[in-house]
């Protein structure tokens, strides 16, 4: 990338500081911007990063789940934003060599939490590929599975969860979501809904652009075709084994 283009990126990202994020997952959008600026050796606001990290730590409720702000709500915001952006902020700050916090150590701890959360997500997928629709922002569709896809992409799936079973589970969930439910309008764009056109499922901030957060579950596409995620023989996922009377790993509290 030429220097002029680099400086344009820096200028535009820096201009986002006018946004005063509320005490919610929005803090991580700010930390993502500032950690990027740190990594490219531009002027960055360390306070915006560290204050976001402190709040996310404060909002951890245990066993892989975060509260999106001071009051807990049962939704998929751990999937849409919190787990992925928390990990990415910590990784980027560590890569940038920023001193102050033990960003690498915090990343290791956050990774374990995401592994437990991804284990739960895998267990959410029913034997026939459905997963529960609950909480706000459900028109983001398959973005609910982003951390599971991310752990597959990282090569960091939790023990007892194989790459093949994740591939098979996600594939079946994609089929259930997109095969025959009128998910696209006449222009070929996604409709507002969890699966199909369900405008009543929208929140006031839902728009046609945000629907494409569903593509966040495509992270394993970053793996080469020769990767074991793609080449391993199909395997049943947890709920298939459980409902067919086969042995499956016992779940338990992690922390």
Where are these regions (language model features)?
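Short, mixed-charge aromatic SLiMs
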Residues: 11-20, 57-64, 112-124, 169-184, ...
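Generic secondary-structure signature for well-ordered alpha-helical cores
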Residues: 39, 58-61, 90-94, 119-126, ...
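Terminal, non-catalytic domain-edge segments
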Residues: 147-255
């Amino acid at each position: 990338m030429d220097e002029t283009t680099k400086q344009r990126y820096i200028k535009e990202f820096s201009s986002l500081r006018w946004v005063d994020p509320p005490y919610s997952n929005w803090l991580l959008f700010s930390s993502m911007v500032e950690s990027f600026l740190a990594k490219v050796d531009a002027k960055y606001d360390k306070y915006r990063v560290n204050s976001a990290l402190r709040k996310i730590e404060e909002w951890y409720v245990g066993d892989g789940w975060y509260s999106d702000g001071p009051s807990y709500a049962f939704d998929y915001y751990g999937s849409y934003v919190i787990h992925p952006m928390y990990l990415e902020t910590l990784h980027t700050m560590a890569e940038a060599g920023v001193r102050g916090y033990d960003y690498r150590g915090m990343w290791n701890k956050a990774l374990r939490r995401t592994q437990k959360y991804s284990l739960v997500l895998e267990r959410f997928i029913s034997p026939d590929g459905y997963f529960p629709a609950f909480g706000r922002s459900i028109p983001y569709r398959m973005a609910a599975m982003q951390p599971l896809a991310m752990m597959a992409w990282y090569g960091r799936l939790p023990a007892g969860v194989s790459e093949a079973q994740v591939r098979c589970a996600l594939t079946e969930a994609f089929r259930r979501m997109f095969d025959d439910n009128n998910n696209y309008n006449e222009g070929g764009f996604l409709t507002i809904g969890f699966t199909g056109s369900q405008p009543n499922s929208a929140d006031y901030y839902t728009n046609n652009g945000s629907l494409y957060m569903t593509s966040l579950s495509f992270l394993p596409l970053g793996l080469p075709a020769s990767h074991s995620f793609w080449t391993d023989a199909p395997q049943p996922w947890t709920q298939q084994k459980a409902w067919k009377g086969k042995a499956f790993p016992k779940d338990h509290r992690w922390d």
